[in-house]
Amino acid sequence: MEKPTSSTNGEKRKSPCDSNNRNDEMQETPNRDLALEPSLKKMKTSEYSTVLVLCYRKTKKIHSNQLENDQSQENSVNPVQEEEDEGSSQEDEDLDSSAESSKQDEDLQLPEGSFQEDKDLGLSEGSSQEDEDLDSSERSSQEEKDPDASEGSSEEGEED
């Protein structure tokens, strides 16, 4: 099966058999198919996985962000709420102290000048307003406790 070729100048070369050519072609074809298939699979897989991963990550990010946001909101809101609670408790304490001072004022029956003294001590005008508000709320609570007494006092007011 050796044939001299003109290009080899009389040198004998082995030419491949037809069966070998077929085997090579068959091997090349599946390799080509396999080579194309993985690249297609990779592209398809990467496209689909990218879409799935993006969706998954979005969902995951949303959940993780929500959890982180919830935790951060709890952490950030709680200190704010605690500060507000502290602020409101301070206001409550201020109201309690002003209520006590107004009770003391009532007990001592100080003249109206006591409000001026409060202003001189550095208390704001609002604190005297709060004292007046507390006095009216104390009166209303006393009226609720003693409806007969409030009726009597209202009758006295009508007589004047």
UniProtKB/Swiss-Prot annotation:
| Compositional bias of kind Acidic residues | 81-97
- Give the region (Disordered) as residue ranges: 1-48, 64-160
Q: Where is the composition biased (Basic and acidic residues)?
A: 10-35, 136-148
Q: Which InterPro entries match?
A: SPAN-X_fam (IPR010007)
Q: Specify residue ranges for compositional bias: Polar residues.
A: 64-79
Q: Which family does it belong to?
A: Belongs to the SPAN-X family.
The name this protein goes by in its record: Sperm protein associated with the nucleus on the X chromosome N2
